């Protein structure tokens, strides 16, 4: 039987009259899609190698290149889409699991897009953030149920209650966990510098700690995952908080996977594994099989850090996310990270990324409600991740019950990512998801930091504008305030789970 050719996903069109044969597109394509024919004096493209990163299109000096989606026409079949056919063709040829990157791109509709916000008029005047103070600073960590104060003989009032360690965020947005290995050092440095500039935090991910990041300890969260790469007492004390990764929104129930192609000498040194070998994190932590085991690890980390840093637990948004989160809080977690089905990744089985988990909107709503019902909401902050696209999503997530959000894909887009979903190949032309020195130098961390910081500043301005329009002058007054939300086109049971009313219904 002849080998079936999988149709190319993208087609590169080149205007031969505009092309000056500078061969820039040939030199820069790390996938080898473009090539030059000396005899014909023309540049051609092997479309099957194109991943749709648009880098050649961006650097073409005469704008001669257009990269477009290939229209793979088949007999119209509602059940058998081109995606299904191409997937079967690939697996029939290779016998392997289909890998992919970034977040879930299935056409599940976003519940954030079905939720609208309130605005104040007449009886509850709005606030102008340009003329009146607006507080969007928030703190991540365990809060006390009540505060006690005492007065000295000289009349000085002091706080008697001992406050647990907190992370101070000047804007309620942090950069999510992306490890050294999955993305380049220049990409991490961009986010680290942006976090320091804006006054928020970035997360190292599970790949250990390169020495170049140690100067950012005041804005850094270190992560402990099942692979325990680079974990030591020194590592745990190198940041401002420690996060235990139990699950990830892009691949709940399975471990991490860094392909050997991306394990270069620096990655090998940081992760403490041989060069060129796959870095595999097991599905479970092999010392955590119960809430009691999780509690033991949480307090072991607290002991190692002298109880000076918040310890968080990251879980994927799954069907029983509420009791899992409640158990983690009772086990001693100072904050809970919930990663939704739209969460991104550097590498994951496509079948898992696309079909496992639940939307973050439902997850944060039910977790916040569960913690309130159990009377332990003050014991931990909630951070949500997985598909946060803009400042409106941030506001809606906080109103549903979050204290702050993580962004990953949005941050990478600010650095130049075009969502070609091939991070696992390690050939990112934009210098982000690669360890090839020829490619990583394409990303200038100073420029990247400025762009990422600009993104957060822009969102901060928009958050203040929306809060002012609601008549709210502090982000704390928004947290869990579902009265400012209304659902559009949602079923009754969906509204009930989200804890919001339908649009048109008053207070």
Swiss-Prot record:
Cofactor list: FMN
Superkingdom, natural source: Bacteria
Keywords associated with the record: 4Fe-4S, Amino-acid biosynthesis, Flavoprotein, FMN, Glutamate biosynthesis, Iron, Iron-sulfur, Metal-binding, NADP, Oxidoreductase, Repeat
PROSITE patterns per UniProt: 4FE4S_FER_1, 4FE4S_FER_2
One Pfam family matching this protein: Fer4_7
Keyword Glycosyltransferase applies: no
Chain segments annotated as transmembrane: none
Chain ranges of the 4Fe-4S ferredoxin-type domain: 10-39, 41-70
One Gene Ontology term from the biological process aspect of the record: glutamate biosynthetic process
Family the entry assigns: Belongs to the glutamate synthase family.
Protein name in the entry: Archaeal-type glutamate synthase [NADPH]
Gene that produces this protein: gltB
GO molecular function, one term: glutamate synthase (NADPH) activity
């Amino acid at each position: 039987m002849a080998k079936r050719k999988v149709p190319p996903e993208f087609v590169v069109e080149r205007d031969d009259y505009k092309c000056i044969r500078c061969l820039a597109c040939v030199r820069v394509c790390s996938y080898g899609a473009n090539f030059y024919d000396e005899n014909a004096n023309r540049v051609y493209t092997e479309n099957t190698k194109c991943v749709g990163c648009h880098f050649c299109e961006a650097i073409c000096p005469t704008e001669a290149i257009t990269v477009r989606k290939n229209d793979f026409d088949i007999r119209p079949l509602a059940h058998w889409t081109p995606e299904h056919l191409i997937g079967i063709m690939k697996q029939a040829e290779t016998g392997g699991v289909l890998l992919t990157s970034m977040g879930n791109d299935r056409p599940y509709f976003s519940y954030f897009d079905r939720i609208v916000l309130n605005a104040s008029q007449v009886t509850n005047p709005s606030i102008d953030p340009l003329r009146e103070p607006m507080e969007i600073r928030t703190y991540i960590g365990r809060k006390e149920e009540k505060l006690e104060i005492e007065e000295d003989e000289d009349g000085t009032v002091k706080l008697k209650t001992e406050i647990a360690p907190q992370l101070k965020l000047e804007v309620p947005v942090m950069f999510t966990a992306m490890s050294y290995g999955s993305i380049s050092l220049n990409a991490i440095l961009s986010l680290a510098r942006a976090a320091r500039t804006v006054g928020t935090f970035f997360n190292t991910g599970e790949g250990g700690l390169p020495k170049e990041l140690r100067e950012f300890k005041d804005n850094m969260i270190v992560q402990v995952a099942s692979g325990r790469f680079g974990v030591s007492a020194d590592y745990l004390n190198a940041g401002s908080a420690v996060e235990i990764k139990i699950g990830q929104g892009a691949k709940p129930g399975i471990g991490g996977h860094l392909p050997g192609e991306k394990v270069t000498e620096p990655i090998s040194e940081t992760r403490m594994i041989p060069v060129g070998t796959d870095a595999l994190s097991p599905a479970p932590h092999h010392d955590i099989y119960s809430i009691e085991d999780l509690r033991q690890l949480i307090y072991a980390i607290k002991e190692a850090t002298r109880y000076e840093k918040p310890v968080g637990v990251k879980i994927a948004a799954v069907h029983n996310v509420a009791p899992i989160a409640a158990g983690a809080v009772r086990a001693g977690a100072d904050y809970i990270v919930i990663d939704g089905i739209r969460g991104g990744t550097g590498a994951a089985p496509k079948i898992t990324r696309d079909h496992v988990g639940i939307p973050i909107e439902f997850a944060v709503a039910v977790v916040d409600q569960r913690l309130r019902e159990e009377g332990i909401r003050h014991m931990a902050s909630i951070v949500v991740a997985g598909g946060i696209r803009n400042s409106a999503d941030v506001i809606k997530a906080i109103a549903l019950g979050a204290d702050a959000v993580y962004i990953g894909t949005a941050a990478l887009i600010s650095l130049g990512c075009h969502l070609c979903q091939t991070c696992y190949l390690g050939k990112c032309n934009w210098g982000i998801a690669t360890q090839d020195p020829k490619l990583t130098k394409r990303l200038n961390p100073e420029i990247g930091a400025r762009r990422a910081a600009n993104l957060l500043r822009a969102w901060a301005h928009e958050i203040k504008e929306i809060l002012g329009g609601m008549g709210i002058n502090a982000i704390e007054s928004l947290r869990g305030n579902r009265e400012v939300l209304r659902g559009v086109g949602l079923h009754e049971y969906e509204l009930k789970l989200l804890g919001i009313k339908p649009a048109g219904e008053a207070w």
